[in-house]
Every structure is written in structure tokens, then in C-alpha cells.
């Protein structure tokens, strides 16, 4: 694998996916980001086995390939490189990732890309489409009710339910229960008049 990418594009893509990766992980491959280079695109994938985030960005691909490299280390390198620099990523003869930008040179260890866990969408029974703005608003209005207690891990999330073209987000901490209708629900709903 060999590619060239602008520092800002790499930093933006890594910034999105590295948030899922924990710095210290008992499963080493989960500390890495999967990088796939082909057809003029670099795809970055990170997971913690609960969430998977992928980001696609344009890159000049000289040799296609797929590797996994330490996510936070690569992000820190990209963050400290000068603005406007071209970053060259390539696998060297020792099966390590060389990161070159101007006079800077880094070599990172790799793990086999075949060991990276793949989350598939097979088996999901529901699918929905919503704008990023509306989805963000739906989550933001609901997340205050999420439990933060480690002993009640089953309440540490938001339940999203779609039915008959409507989407609801529900969260509870055991004391509070909040349900947020989708923006489409709010536009259609009417409060009954007082009698």
C-alpha cells in the first residue's frame, strides 16, 4: 500500500474515527484503525465492538492495500504536522507503516488487517433515513436522561424506535424517562384543546 494525502484531509478523517478507539485496550487490534486504499479513496474504520465508525476521504493511491495502524499515534502525528503538507503513507519492507511529510519521518507497527473485527449490517430488521441535523437534535434532546451508573449498564444508551414512518428516541436512568419524537412527529402532532 502506498498513498499520498493532504494533512488536513487525513486529520479530519482520523479525528472522526479515533474517538471510538480507547487508548488502552485489552484487545490490541481495537487500538488500531483499519485503512483501506483503493480507487482514489482512503477508507478509515475504527470499532470498540459496540460502535463502528468509518470515514472515506480522497487520496492519491499509488499502490492499493489494507493495513491497521495505531489510531491515536497516527492521529497525534497528523495533528502535529504543518498545515498544507502532503502525507505519504506506505508499507515498508519490514511490514511497518512509514509516515512521511516533508522532513518528518515516522515508522509505526502494524497488525494484520485480517484480524480487524468486521461489523456487518446483516440481521438488522429496521432501517431509517434522517438528516444529520435532525438526528443530532434527536440525540441531543434525549441524552440527558441516559444513566451514567456502571452498575446499570443496560440503561447506558438511547433506544431508537421507528414505526409507521415516525422515529422516537427514548432514554432513562431509572428515575427519569424521556421520549423525543422526530421532527416530523412534532410538525404533525396537535395538542387537544382544553374542554
Residue map of PLM features:
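Structural preference for solvent-exposed beta-strand-turn elements
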Residues: 1-180, 184
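Positively charged, low-complexity/disordered segments
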Residues: 183-185, 189-195
